[in-house]
Curated annotation (Swiss-Prot):
Gene3D superfamilies according to UniProt: HUPs, Isoleucyl-tRNA Synthetase, Domain 1, Valyl-tRNA synthetase, C-terminal domain, Valyl/Leucyl/Isoleucyl-tRNA synthetase, editing domain
CDD domains on file: Anticodon_Ia_Val, ValRS_core
Record text on subunit structure and interactions: Monomer.
Main subcellular location: cytoplasm
Protein name: Valine--tRNA ligase
Enzyme's top EC category: ligase
Length: 951
């Protein structure tokens, strides 16, 4: 094996070999249990970020673990067409390169442009996924707009429409005036903002008066421009100030519309003036009030968010109505919405109707992609009736057919599902699944899979002109079908039979409603088992937290704290990293701050660590459902782990290759250390499997680290040295056999988390074991063997380790050179301790560097020594001749003085009121921790001074 571990030399060639050999495919053995994970399809526009790397490491670990258990294993891969995101990327590209808009191209040519762009750039993310070692079946890769998935989408739409579970309605939606499309509640970002509350007088009609004799009501609003669309004023029915006015009318300023005063609990007596203007076409709460009181709806805005030339007037059901005039005063027509706000306020003021303006804190909705203020807009949209679909989906989680890990996410799921709103599924975009609905010139709607089908089913001749709906479906509509559409539905395929329901879904909690809930609803409606019972899409949902930076901040381009997972694999120089973080910024003014922070954090850029170290770190940080603060030090630690495993394997190979390791017969004698490591290994296998089976990847990673680093490398390899240098033939054979057997088993154990290094080493080790198989990927996963857990060997070795560590600690405390042989005395020994010394003298002498071991009678005072108590004996190391008493006392006095200086410095800091008041809690806690550490170190040094003074 190469002397040094260089991941960059082994990882890519190995992955190409695995893929070429077809190791990622299901084994096709239907007699075996199947195991299937559907990858959450990343956006085709995207590139790999830490969230992907985290989730995909978890998925690949599960897939490799199950594959090694012989299961028929499928990891289904694919990408999402990502409607808005992709359309925006391509629109920006043609604007920058050609100065054109999509309208210059026209719909068909623009869509061709997107397909062309996908062909050029769409492969970035899948190339990056290969770098992570993902063992997905690439031959089954799907795209949410490919032909099969498009057919599934049409099939679902048509069936739901025919069951009256999809309908078209005029409803209020979140409208993005920049992107000119409806967006979902989940794509709206609410931002806190300082604004104003305008108090405006609405004159009462027909000579009516308020309880205190005024001939007007004062209405408070944060959006005066929408006055033009008011159709009512609400007061609380319990409010004594206005009770007598319910059923009367006001005259709306500026447009002179006569609108009713209604009694509704939406009006809060304690807030503002207690009178609320009702604009059903431009506010979600007002829309509900309008429905309760049958108020008309007046839309005053264009899709760009400008004031219309004439309003659209509808009744409560959304039918066109002439109950009010559609006239809008000329001075407001075509004004941009925020300019209209100023103009309306000025006009109201000129009429003497502006009572006052108060500063007001408010929450403003922004589109998370377009970045502009969202308008509630009355539009014709397509909806799914969600309550019918939600019922079985709630029951599936209630009765345990689907389990969330961790369980607390079930509550989040229930709270949304039990109060579910109809789902708006249409989007005013060009890129996506076009809605399979056609209209004739009379406005009749026909739904079908194709235009031909529509004509046939409805007996429409070629002379009837039909035009297809311009809108596309919400991206999440096709994603909701992901678990079954990828397996060939609506055909009844073998893949669907073998792999559905799937086993586990790994997802971030942020898309539990967007995606998880909708998959459960859609799957249970369309997929039934042989008994007609609805099938769930998956049995377990494993929820991950978010990966944050080392300070707990969310990673984002605008903060400049994003770390590309592949930069940790391959390394990146500081100039390249700075370019990545500060180039093409939406907010260039942040660049300097980001540059300083990056230079401080990564003065030399990022070293290459390799994929395995990255995967190990991600697994180790995966505590269920919690957000993770990324830690570069942990990454370095796991890179060192890979190095340690590599070097340990070289040691094993150097001592076993071309040697008799007992695989072809011959007598074998196992030493205490051999029996101990086999027992430790089996206990590790049991605990590790339990951790993986319960999705505790963090615990599994910890178990693997502890066994490999501490037991196998630090102890067992050392304990083999006495046998290697002086053992009999059968003892040598036994130890070599154990070295190779445990290493080979350990490689299989670690393979799901760190696949590259384990395969590389295993290819060398398998030759010694006489294994002829091609790859570790398809080897059986280690199983717990209780017969190999030798309790006596475990107890004896733990005692030996205790004794060796005690001697090593004395060396360190007394500043004795590690190589200097020592005399060891044991006093007050139990019979068990005497037996352990006599049986394992060579281990003790070699590992503790002892020239002699003497057992003293219990009452023997012995020479002046440093002592340690261990189980069943007192250890003494005589000090005479080992150290120069005066020099050592002087050294210790110097150490004590240095520590006292540090203690005084920190105590001074902590007694400074200014520091304590200003410094963050974490900084103060760190200083206190340091203080405790120094106090402990000082106590130890004083103890040593006492021992040496007595010599």
């Amino acid at each position: 094996m190469e002397k040094t571990y260089n991941p960059q030399d082994i990882e890519q060639p190995l992955y190409e070999h695995w893929e070429k050999q077809g190791y990622f495919k299901p084994n096709g053995d239907e007699s075996k249990e199947s195991f299937c994970i559907m990858i959450p399809p990343p956006n085709v526009t995207g590139s790999l970020h830490m969230g992907h790397a985290f989730q995909q490491t978890i998925m690949d670990t599960m897939i490799r673990y199950q594959r090694m258990q012989g299961k028929n294993t499928l990891w289904q891969v694919g990408t999402d067409h990502a409607g808005i995101a992709t359309q925006m990327v391509v629109e920006r590209k043609i604007a920058a390169e050609e100065g054109k808009t999509r309208h210059d191209y026209g719909r068909d040519a623009f869509i061709d442009k997107i397909w062309q762009w996908k062909a050029e750039s769409g492969g970035t993310i899948t190339r990056q996924m290969r770098r992570l070692g993902n063992s997905v079946d690439w031959e089954r890769e799907r795209f949410t707009m490919d032909e099969g998935l498009s057919n599934a989408v049409k099939e679902v739409f048509v069936r739901l429409y025919k069951e009256d579970l999809i309908y078209r309605g005029k409803r209020l939606v979140n409208w993005d005036p920049k992107l000119r499309t409806a967006i979902s509640d989940l794509e709206v970002e609410n931002r806190e903002s300082k604004g104003s509350m305008w108090h405006i007088r609405y004159p009462l009609a027909d000579g009516a008066k308020t309880a205190d004799g005024k001939d007007y009501l004062v209405v408070a609003t944060t959006r005066p421009e929408t006055i033009l669309g008011d159709t009512g004023v609400a007061v609380n029915p319990e409010d004594p100030r206005y009770q007598s006015l319910i059923g009367k009318f006001v005259i709306l300023p500026l447009v002179n519309r006569r609108i009713p005063i209604v009694g509704d609990e939406h009006a809060d007596m304690e807030k503002g003036t207690g009178c609320v203007k009702i604009t059903p076409a431009h506010d979600f709460n007002d829309y509900e009030v309008g429905k309760r009181h049958a108020l008309p709806m007046i839309n005053i805005l264009t899709f760009d968010g400008d004031i219309r030339e004439s309003a659209e007037v509808f009744d409560t059901k959304g039918e066109e109505s002439d109950v009010y005039s559609s006239e809008i005063p000329a001075e407001f027509q075509k004004l941009e919405r925020f300019a209209a706000r100023k103009a309306v306020v000025a006009a109201v003021d000129a009429l003497g109707l502006l009572e006052e303006i108060k500063p007001h804190d408010l929450t403003v909705p922004y589109g998370d992609r377009g970045g502009v203020v969202i308008e509630p807009m009355l539009t014709d949209q397509w909806y799914v009736r969600a309550d019918v679909l939600a019922k079985p989906a709630v029951e599936a989680v209630e009765n345990g057919d689907i389990q969330f890990v961790p369980k607390q996410y079930e509550n989040m799921y229930f709270s949304w599902m039990r109060d579910i709103q109809d789902w708006c599924i249409s989007r005013q975009l060009w890129w996506g699944h076009r809605i399979p609905a056609w209209y004739d010139n009379d406005g009749n709607v026909y739904v079908g899979r194709t235009e031909d089908e529509v004509r046939q089913e409805n007996n429409l001749g070629a002379d009837v002109a039909l035009r297809q709906d311009e809108d596309v479906l919400d991206t999440w509509f096709s994603s909701a079908l992901w678990t079954f559409s990828t397996l060939g539905w609506p055909e009844n395929t073998d893949a669907l039979r073998q792999f559905h329901p799937t086993s586990v879904m790994v997802s971030g909690f942020d898309i539990i409603f967007f995606w998880i809930a909708r998959m459960i609803m859609m799957t249970m409606h369309f997929i039934k088992d042989e008994n007609g019972k609805p099938q769930v899409p998956f049995h377990t949902v494993y929820m991950t937290g978010l990966i944050r930076d080392d300070e707990g901040q969310k990673m984002s381009k605008s903060k400049g704290n994003v770390i590309d997972p592949l930069d940790m694999v391959d390394g990146i120089s500081l100039p390249e990293l700075l370019e990545k973080r500060t180039g093409n910024m939406m907010q260039p003014q942040m660049a300097e701050k980001i540059r300083k922070r990056t230079e401080k954090q990564f003065p030399n850029g990022i070293e290459p660590h390799g994929t395995d170290a990255l995967r190990f770190t991600l697994a180790a940080l995966a505590s269920t459902g919690r957000d993770i603060n990324w830690d570069m030090k942990r990454l370095e630690g796991y890179r060192n782990f890979c190095n340690k495993l590599w070097n340990a394997s070289r040691f094993v190979l150097m001592n076993t290759e071309e040697q008799d390791c007992g695989f072809n017969g011959g007598e074998m004698t196992l030493s205490l250390a051999d029996r101990w490591i086999l027992a430790e290994f089996n206990q590790t296998v049991k605990a590790y499997r339990d951790a993986l089976d319960s999705f505790r990847f963090d615990i599994a990673a910890g178990i693997l680290y502890e066994f490999t680093w501490n037991q196998f490398c630090d102890w067992y390899l050392e304990l083999t040295k006495p046998v290697m240098t002086g053992g009999s033939e059968s003892e040598l054979r036994g130890t070599r056999h154990t070295l190779v057997t445990v290493l080979e088993g350990l490689l299989r154990l670690a393979h799901p988390i760190i696949p590259f290094i384990t395969e590389t080493i295993w290819q060398r080790v398998k030759v010694i074991c006489g294994i002829t198989a091609d790859t570790i990927m398809l080897q059986p996963f280690p199983e717990y063997n209780a017969a190999q857990v030798d309790e006596a060997a475990l107890a004896d070795t733990e005692w030996l380790k205790q004794a060796i560590v005690a001697v090593r600690n004395i060396r360190a405390e007394m500043n004795i050179a590690p190589g200097k042989p020592l005399e060891l005395l044991l006093r007050g020994c139990s019979e068990e301790a005497v037996r352990r010394v006599n049986d394992n003298r060579s281990f003790l002498q070699t590992l503790a560097r002892l020239e002699s071991i003497t057992v003293l009678p219990a009452d023997d005072k012995g020479p002046v020594s440093v002592t340690k108590i261990i189980d069943g004996a007192e250890l003494l190391i005589p000090m005479a001749g080992l150290i120069n008493k005066d020099d050592e006392l002087a050294r210790l006095a110097k150490e004590v003085a240095k520590i006292e200086g540090e203690i005084a410095r920190i105590e001074g800091k902590l007694s400074n009121e200014g520091f304590v008041a200003r410094a963050p809690e974490a900084v103060i806690a760190k200083e206190r921790e340091k203080l405790d550490g120094y106090a402990e170190a000082k106590a130890k040094l004083i103890e040593q001074q006492a021992v040496i003074s007595a010599l």
